[in-house]
Amino acid sequence: LSVGNGPEDITFDKEGNLYTALASGDILKLIFDNNAFISPTIIANTGGRPLGLKFNADGNLIVADAIKGLLEVTLMGDVNTLVDNYAAEPLRFVDHLVIDQSGVIYFSDASTRFTIENYKYDFIEASQTGRVFAYDPSLDSLTLLVDDVFFANGVALSKDERFLLINETGKARILRYDLHGGAGEGATVFVDNLPGLPDNLVWGTDGIIWVALIALRDPLLDGLAEKTLLRTLLGGLPHSWLPEGKHYGLVLGLDEDGRVLHNLQTADGYTQITTAISRNKKLYLGSLHQDHVGVVDIKNLQ
């Protein structure tokens, strides 16, 4: 499905129409008609870099914008800011979100040190300043749930809404945060030592947790934590010179206990996958730099 550069996340409305957001700031709608998607139309532009997006109960899009913060976007094109700071400090890298049945929005802020324009430095520095928040629109209240995360990325709610899954990209693992636990309990490890760097994750209606891995792990980046001098040297390089994981297409399907059910890979097809959403026996894929939404038939997966 051709859409334009960087369809990082994907969501659907009740009629089955597809929505995505691009590097240009555009939010697109692809109408589903006669078993096919019609060419996209622009419904809004955030003026930033929209990443995650989900519909709320009012039929508006809640958007995690890396530059502008947490936004509410109407289908008429109005863009309203919900959250753009915490403790009087701007949110630098709002990344992904999920909404519970009561309307509370859980969202990630990847780093307090770096923005989307220079995010690679976060992996070099290993600042581990990512956070996850809960925002209640009915009370206009913002609560910090988890901090000290090495690049907080995708978030997903369990089906019973008792816990939250958080992709910790910099450590190639998934965290679990108990929403009904005692104060100060923090997050625990749900899945460790993933083969790539996890971006978004979605708990699908099929009961499978679909995890998109944007790149394979880089041995150089894996070993930087103990190499202070090398980190310092790399930190002085232009951003475009910094290493990044090998471009590869990789999506994992996990069960509720974190066991791998499906392992979908391609070395030269749709790569740098940022999200994977299952719908009607198909897997819809988003990417940071591709110019189209990928579609994979999964009806024959066992």
Model regions and ranges:
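Sequence-structural signature of mature extracellular/luminal beta-sheet repeat domains
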Residues: 1-302
